[in-house]
């Protein structure tokens, strides 16, 4: 059985136990992820094409490794200008092993890991609780009196013409 899945803006033709490199998928090594955007599912005698996706189809995969692809060098040169620019870029990729291709609303054998967003929300709640329980006593400083600069004596102006 094979499937065509869509992830990271690209389409991949996958079969069970295949190792494939895709654009970065959120998760850690050993996590199981699901792909719901299945464009086509097929066997030797039967093929189902989705419009745009196949209903009740699911592909599960295990994250083997989070890695970075080869460096791509971008070089620009403007002739007779003494101007050039060299840049390098490494795309983050995820190496996956396809575990199962399921159709008809079947559930996967291995449990799928919790989404990262839920874990982050749980983490935030626990940090709020710990911050509330821990209280730091601070001694209040007494406000100091502001000292003003000494005032200058005004010059005496006389109205006498004798001076």
UniProtKB/Swiss-Prot annotation:
Q: Where is this region: Disordered?
A: 124-163
Q: Which UniProt keywords apply?
A: Ribonucleoprotein, Ribosomal protein, RNA-binding, rRNA-binding
Top-level division of the source organism's lineage: Bacteria
Q: Which residues, if any, are the signal sequence?
A: none
Q: Name one GO biological process term.
A: translation
Gene Ontology molecular functions: rRNA binding; structural constituent of ribosome
Instruction: Return the GO cellular component terms, semicolon-separated.
Output: cytoplasm; ribonucleoprotein complex; ribosome
One Pfam family this sequence matches? Ribosomal_L21p
> Keyword Protein biosynthesis: yes or no?
no
Q: Which NCBIfam families match?
A: L21
Give the function comment from the record: This protein binds to 23S rRNA in the presence of protein L20.
- SUBUNIT field: Part of the 50S ribosomal subunit. Contacts protein L20.
Family membership noted in the UniProt record: Belongs to the bacterial ribosomal protein bL21 family.
Q: What is this protein called?
A: Large ribosomal subunit protein bL21
Organism, by scientific name, is: Bartonella quintana (strain Toulouse) (Rochalimaea quintana)
Source species taxonomy: Bacteria, Pseudomonadati, Pseudomonadota, Alphaproteobacteria, Hyphomicrobiales
């Amino acid at each position: 059985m094979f499937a065509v899945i869509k992830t990271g803006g690209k389409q991949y033709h996958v079969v069970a136990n295949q190792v494939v490199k895709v654009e970065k998928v959120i998760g850690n090594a050993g996590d199981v992820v699901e792909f719901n955007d299945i464009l086509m599912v097929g066997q030797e005698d039967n093929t189902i094409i989705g419009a745009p996706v196949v209903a009740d189809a699911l592909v599960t995969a295990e994250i083997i490794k989070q890695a970075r692809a080869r460096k791509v060098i971008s070089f620009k040169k403007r002739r007779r200008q003494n101007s050039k620019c060299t840049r390098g870029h490494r795309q983050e990729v995820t190496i996956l092993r396809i575990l199962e291709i399921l159709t008809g609303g079947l559930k996967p054998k291995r449990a799928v890991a919790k989404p990262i967003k839920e874990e982050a929300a749980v983490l935030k709640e626990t940090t709020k609780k710990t911050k509330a329980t821990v209280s730091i006593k601070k001694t209040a400083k007494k406000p100091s009196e502001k000292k003003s600069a000494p005032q200058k004596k005004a010059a005496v102006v006389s109205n006498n013409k004798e001076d």
